[in-house]
């Protein structure tokens, strides 16, 4: 008999950002029971777990709101001890601002954080020493709205999605420089294959999420990292925003869907979709409906479970990736219009 996708998860924890809370909450990965929460600075966005130092990093991007519609950019990273559920330190990156995307090279002890442009510098990636928790470098991306980042397994190259800019920045992390601009019609989530041969980019830029029939076709652009060029598109029905690659080679794509409001009113968020591709063959394997406005996706280390955080419905959806069946919905308490955002899966301590 095949084991349940939930089996063997005792002691594992899922951390979830409530952007409006503002909190980081912790859930038992075996049964989704809420274990507690931690109040943090407004407004937290993304999470990244460092398994070597057992620390959870959280970006604080805006004082309120979201990209291009906010109440001012923040400058902080929050460092959390997830086992004690306490804030260890607040790292201020000023004058850098709007930290958002996070990618960790745990072996080399480097954390990469996207930041937006200011009057005197373009957007970029700030390099943090994961041991000292201090900035040790900055790499310009050449774009204003650098927002998501993915690093290859070798820790040598990063790919940065730059929102409305018509390119993704390829960065040489050893030289600290841009090596290529990959042409795309704007970009959202980004991921890199395990062998580093391909990058995957959600495109086009989602803008207001309303889309348009005359715009570029939505989907995932497949980038040959050797030539820094798009070689294929994995089509989606609706705008693709978050991307995530599992340890088993599944490419998880969050599709944002909208609908007209009552009586022809303003466009509003409708239930979204998790679409799954085989990253190697590029075959579409299927999908499952999730909550409104999926913004972040992660998975369990064994690649059996997907977690989809949906901002507008303030829910996290747990999906069995073998059966593509929804197992549970976690309702994240939201104090405002926005809710669930950043996610991190925390395996139990050895």
Give names to the regions the model predicted.
Residues 1-350:
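Predominantly soluble domains enriched in secretory-pathway, periplasmic, or organellar proteins
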């Amino acid at each position: 008999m095949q084991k349940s996708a939930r089996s063997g998860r005792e002691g594992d924890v899922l951390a979830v950002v409530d952007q409006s809370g503002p909190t980081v909450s912790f859930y038992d990965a075996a049964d989704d029971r809420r274990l507690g929460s931690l109040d943090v600075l407004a407004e937290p966005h993304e999470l990244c777990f460092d398994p070597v130092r057992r620390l959870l990093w959280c970006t604080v991007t805006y004082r309120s709101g979201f990209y291009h519609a906010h109440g001012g950019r923040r400058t902080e990273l929050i460092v959390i001890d997830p086992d004690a559920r306490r804030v260890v330190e607040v790292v201020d990156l000023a004058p850098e601002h709007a930290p958002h995307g996070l990618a960790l090279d745990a072996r080399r002890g480097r954390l990469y954080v996207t930041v937006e442009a200011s009057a005197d510098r373009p957007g970029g990636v700030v390099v943090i020493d994961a041991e000292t928790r201090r900035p040790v470098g900055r790499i310009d991306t050449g774009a204003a709205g650098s927002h998501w980042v993915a690093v290859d397994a070798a820790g040598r190259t990063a790919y940065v999605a730059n929102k409305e800019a018509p390119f993704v920045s390829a960065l040489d992390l050893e030289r600290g420089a841009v090596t290529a601009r990959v042409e795309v019609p704007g970009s959202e989530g980004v991921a890199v294959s395990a062998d580093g041969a391909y990058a995957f980019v959600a495109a086009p830029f989602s803008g207001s999420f309303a889309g348009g029939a005359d715009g570029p076709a939505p989907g995932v652009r497949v980038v040959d990292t050797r030539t820094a060029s798009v070689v294929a598109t994995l089509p989606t029905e609706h705008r693709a925003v978050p991307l995530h690659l599992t340890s088993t080679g599944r490419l998880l794509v969050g599709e944002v869907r909208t609908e007209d409001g009552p009586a022809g009113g303003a466009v509003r968020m409708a239930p979204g979709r998790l679409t799954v591709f085989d990253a190697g063959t590029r075959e579409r394997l299927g999908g499952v409906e999730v909550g409104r406005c999926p913004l972040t996706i992660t998975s369990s280390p064994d690649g059996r479970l997907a977690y989809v955080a949906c901002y507008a419905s303030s829910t996290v959806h747990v999906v069995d990736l073998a059966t593509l069946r929804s197992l549970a919905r976690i309702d994240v308490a939201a104090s405002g219009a926005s809710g669930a955002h950043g996610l991190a899966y925390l395996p139990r301590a050895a």
